[in-house]
């Protein structure tokens, strides 16, 4: 069987990394800027933080503040945001280490994700799985994150990775991770930050500018990067028996990929799993989770320009899992100390340094 995982920021959040855009904004706004365009943007951002939950989508709207005559100013702003975000994420990434015990759990979650389903869902998936089982399981992972946390956990080094055997009944099946791709690059290479298509660039002049398109439209940026990672990811989705979406908001700026996933489910017997975090569900009324699951199915198909029968087929073949502990591992600091403990223990040294600096001034 062929499995494809699409991994989003929820993966890093589950590791307790502060990788939400809001976390980054606090840092970004505090950084000094000499450039007037960047300073003005930070003022706008600071006054409208609640409206900037989706940085990429809002950048497409913010393009309205520019024209062809000052397109270079817009490019400078985009590059400044990208560079600052990369630096911030590198700091978060550097804090992360993982134990062997957590690695084992993460590998087990990858090859036995169905354990997080309800008993009824597990039974339904088991019926689907039996006729599709082969001598081994092939896992391909597409991450939308820029960080290196996934590589640290799984030890990925660019070659097929043996994840061990998976027992089903009296049989044992080998499991291999054959592909791992940063579809939007990393903080150090081909980092892609942008919108799904030209319709999300609200300024018509910039929308038609090849310079802006190459800097802001994800599909064009990937094509121009020339790595062919987008082709490899599309091929993986087109051949998948099972597709799992984990930790992704199902937002508009990744609509290109929702279309590829939806097409595979609509045109085949493949199954889609969406793992999502929602508000706390009262244990007394856990049966009401079905409403939330239906909402998530509807959200997914709302991005697809498909006919109604195709959308209904996709919803029937989609499992939704809420608030699972999948990929939940600990964030380990040196000697298991938290950042707050480290700062507290070094408070005296920091005070001494500040006094010395004061005398120098």
Residue ranges and their predicted role:
Residues 183-188, 198, 248-249:
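Histidine- and/or cysteine-centered catalytic micro-motif in compact active-site loops
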Residues 1-15, 231-361:
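SIR2/sirtuin-family catalytic core signature
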Residues 41-43, 191-238, 246, 288-297:
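Acidic, metal/cofactor-coordinating or nucleic-acid-engaging core segments within structured domains
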